[in-house]
Amino acid sequence: MTTLADLRLIASGKVRELYDLESVADGPSTLLMVASDRISTYDAVHPTPIPDKGKVLTGLSVFWFERTREIVANHMVSTVDGVPEEALGRALVVRRLEMLPVECVVRGYITGSGWKDYQATGAVSGIALRAGLRESERLPEPIFTPSTKADVGHDEAIDFERAAELVGDRKLMERVRDASIELYSFAAEHARERGVILADTKFEFGLPSTETGEGGGEGEPELVLGDEVLTPDSSRYWPADGYEVGHGQPSFDKQFVRDWASASGWDKRPPAPAIPQEVVAGTRARYVEAYERITGEPFEAWLERTGAAADAAGFGGAAGLGASADAG
């Protein structure tokens, strides 16, 4: 049986690893994408993992990949076949893509860095908004606010024209924008029915890799949704009960850790400090609650379908949300 140690690691980020499956799968067309339990704040990874976080991120991505195929193709190939046993539940076999050099942010509410930009300029990514908006207010229509992909430091917000320049194909960028807004609108409606507000989210798209012989055909290139999708790490999810315009909202994400880090006395420079057990437990509870609220099923159902074991024996159920969110 293949193990992670048998595979060639080709990329490692703050949360995910990518492994080459060329030697064990159907040629060079697939990769193994593994979501870890690592968590970062202020661009530094903490030494303390959040149990089951990687499984929540993967399970939610699968939930959305399966439900959005009619909107746009995605890179998911398998959740079990080809996945090493130790990575079950937290890994996907995915298509190899040539990723576009922009992150595709859609905002339905004015919050985070968008709120800061609006306060300063009255606009977000070059899109002028009406005067008098309050923090966390719902926008009349979702807006597409792309950003650069920064290898180091923070991504930079850009307007659509700059995104089209970076991609090098305006028509393709228009397809990306339209798909992003349609994905957001579909997910926001589903979340609303589940008592959750999808305030904003980030998508990443790619094209079939020319290395594998999939790309380069006649006509429009196939647009493929990649990376993770609509998870608490790539999105702001707020509980609808208690939503109130005029301030930051509680959220189903790492804001609980971010708030602790801000109050801990840490100077926000690496190395990041260890996270106390009660903060770990509270953060895990928020991630699991996000999965269960959005999917309508217990988190254990995802573990059973993939043959995975929970990481978090001894952790209690979901805690109530109380930390205010104001991420980027």
What are these regions (language model features)?
Residues M1-K149, D267-A274, E278-G316, G320, ...:
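Active-site loop/lid in soluble adenylation, ligation, and acyl-transfer enzymes
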Residues K55, G59, K171, R175-D178, ...:
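Generic recognition of stable, solvent-exposed alpha-helical segments in well-folded globular domains
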Residues R95-L97, E193-T201, G206, T283-R284:
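Short, active-site-adjacent segments that bind or coordinate small-molecule cofactors and metal centers
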Residues R138-R170:
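A short mid-domain helix/strand-loop element embedded in enzyme catalytic domains
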Residues G168-A199:
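A long amphipathic alpha-helix within ATP-dependent nucleotide-binding catalytic cores
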Residues A199, F203-Q255:
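Catalytic activation segment of kinase domains across protein kinase-like and atypical kinase folds
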Residues L230-E289:
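Surface-exposed, gly/pro-biased binding rims or lids
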